[in-house]
């Protein structure tokens, strides 16, 4: 199974390669585009980073908004904290 790093790297390398070929006019894509779209090709990496950041922010906000309250996990965690405190008191590390 391919790791996520390899998958993302392949997409990024492909995007950069296509953009670089279009930007340096090795592949004459800009001659077929209207003049108003040339700036989109020139600033495509900036737009890609910008949209990736926007996606990341909305993904985090969505994750926080739909986060479930885990009552069982809270009780379990409080029990583990109590056990740790009792053990530290037995070892006389805390009072």
From Swiss-Prot:
It is found in: Endoplasmic reticulum membrane. Its main location: endoplasmic reticulum. Keywords: Endoplasmic reticulum, Membrane, Transmembrane, Transmembrane helix. Disulfide bonds: none annotated. One of its GO terms (biological process) is GPI anchor biosynthetic process. It holds the Pfam family DPM3. The keyword Transmembrane applies. It is a multi-pass membrane protein. The chain crosses the membrane at residues 10-30, 44-64. Pathway: Protein modification; protein glycosylation. Signal peptide: none annotated. GO terms for cellular component: dolichol-phosphate-mannose synthase complex; endoplasmic reticulum membrane. Belongs to the DPM3 family. Stabilizer subunit of the dolichol-phosphate-mannose synthase complex. This is Probable dolichol-phosphate mannosyltransferase subunit 3. It comes from Caenorhabditis elegans. The lineage of its organism: Eukaryota, Metazoa, Ecdysozoa, Nematoda, Chromadorea.
């Amino acid at each position: 199974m391919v790791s996520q790093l390899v998958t993302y790297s392949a997409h990024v390398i492909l995007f950069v390669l296509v953009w670089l070929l279009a930007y340096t006019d090795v592949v004459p894509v800009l001659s077929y585009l209207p003049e108003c779209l040339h700036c989109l090709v020139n600033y495509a990496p900036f737009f890609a980073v910008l949209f990736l950041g926007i996606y990341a922010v909305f993904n985090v906000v969505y994750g926080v908004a739909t986060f479930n309250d885990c009552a069982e996990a809270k009780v379990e965690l409080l029990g583990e904290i109590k056990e740790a405190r009792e053990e530290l008191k037995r070892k006389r590390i805390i009072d």
